[in-house]
Amino acid sequence: MEMLQGLLLCLLLSTGGAWASKEPLRPLCRPVNAILAAEKEGCPVCVAFNTTICAGYCSSMVRVLQTILPPLPQSVCNYHELRFTSVRLPGCRPGVDPVVSMPVALSCRCGLCRRSYSDCGSLRNEPLGCDYSTFQDSSSKDPPRNLTSPSQLLEPADPPLVPQ
């Protein structure tokens, strides 16, 4: 019986590598493609555009004796290097600046949450989207009527900015 158990153990250990992956079980902190929505009060159209954001897992620790000791600071996935892209919202009322700037992640790293450029809140029940008026996907085939060309939706990005 012991020999059978040993043989079974060897068989399980030798085939265990076939199930294991060299990649981490959860994706680590890195830039990922995302669709964000841009809107502004006074502009009737919400524009969705593709960008990169920082997302993924950072290692963290939890104290066993939480009631006695203070909680440990938790790492979150932050922007390391970023640049800003300007999106022009079509159909804005006169006197309303139609340009909205959005971040584009160039690189990411784990660290303490910095409220100056990160959303440190918990998960939301609803996805981020437009609160005002109509929705216009920047990748749709039909651009808004008042644009002379679809390239007016995206303006050139500023040079890279490294948050402090």
From Swiss-Prot:
<feature type="glycosylation site" description="O-linked (GalNAc...) serine">
    <location>
        <position position="140"/>
    </location>
</feature>
<dbReference type="GO" id="GO:0005179">
    <property type="term" value="F:hormone activity"/>
</dbReference>
<comment type="function">
    <text>Stimulates the ovaries to synthesize the steroids that are essential for the maintenance of pregnancy.</text>
</comment>
<feature type="glycosylation site" description="N-linked (GlcNAc...) asparagine">
    <location>
        <position position="146"/>
    </location>
</feature>
<dbReference type="GO" id="GO:0005615">
    <property type="term" value="C:extracellular space"/>
</dbReference>
<dbReference type="InterPro" id="IPR001545">
    <property type="entry name" value="Gonadotropin_bsu"/>
</dbReference>
<keyword id="KW-0325">Glycoprotein</keyword>
<dbReference type="InterPro" id="IPR006208">
    <property type="entry name" value="Glyco_hormone_CN"/>
</dbReference>
<dbReference type="Pfam" id="PF00007">
    <property type="entry name" value="Cys_knot"/>
</dbReference>
<dbReference type="InterPro" id="IPR018245">
    <property type="entry name" value="Gonadotropin_bsu_CS"/>
</dbReference>
<dbReference type="GO" id="GO:0005737">
    <property type="term" value="C:cytoplasm"/>
</dbReference>
<keyword id="KW-0732">Signal</keyword>
<keyword id="KW-0964">Secreted</keyword>
<feature type="disulfide bond">
    <location>
        <begin position="29"/>
        <end position="77"/>
    </location>
</feature>
<protein>
    <recommendedName>
        <fullName>Choriogonadotropin subunit beta</fullName>
    </recommendedName>
</protein>
<keyword id="KW-0372">Hormone</keyword>
<feature type="glycosylation site" description="N-linked (GlcNAc...) asparagine">
    <location>
        <position position="50"/>
    </location>
</feature>
<feature type="disulfide bond">
    <location>
        <begin position="113"/>
        <end position="120"/>
    </location>
</feature>
<feature type="disulfide bond">
    <location>
        <begin position="43"/>
        <end position="92"/>
    </location>
</feature>
<comment type="similarity">
    <text>Belongs to the glycoprotein hormones subunit beta family.</text>
</comment>
<feature type="region of interest" description="Disordered">
    <location>
        <begin position="135"/>
        <end position="164"/>
    </location>
</feature>
<comment type="subunit">
    <text>Heterodimer of a common alpha chain and a unique beta chain which confers biological specificity to thyrotropin, lutropin, follitropin and gonadotropin.</text>
</comment>
<feature type="signal peptide">
    <location>
        <begin position="1"/>
        <end position="20"/>
    </location>
</feature>
<dbReference type="GO" id="GO:0007186">
    <property type="term" value="P:G protein-coupled receptor signaling pathway"/>
</dbReference>
<feature type="disulfide bond">
    <location>
        <begin position="58"/>
        <end position="110"/>
    </location>
</feature>
<feature type="disulfide bond">
    <location>
        <begin position="46"/>
        <end position="130"/>
    </location>
</feature>
<keyword id="KW-1015">Disulfide bond</keyword>
<feature type="disulfide bond">
    <location>
        <begin position="54"/>
        <end position="108"/>
    </location>
</feature>
<dbReference type="InterPro" id="IPR029034">
    <property type="entry name" value="Cystine-knot_cytokine"/>
</dbReference>
<feature type="glycosylation site" description="O-linked (GalNAc...) serine">
    <location>
        <position position="151"/>
    </location>
</feature>
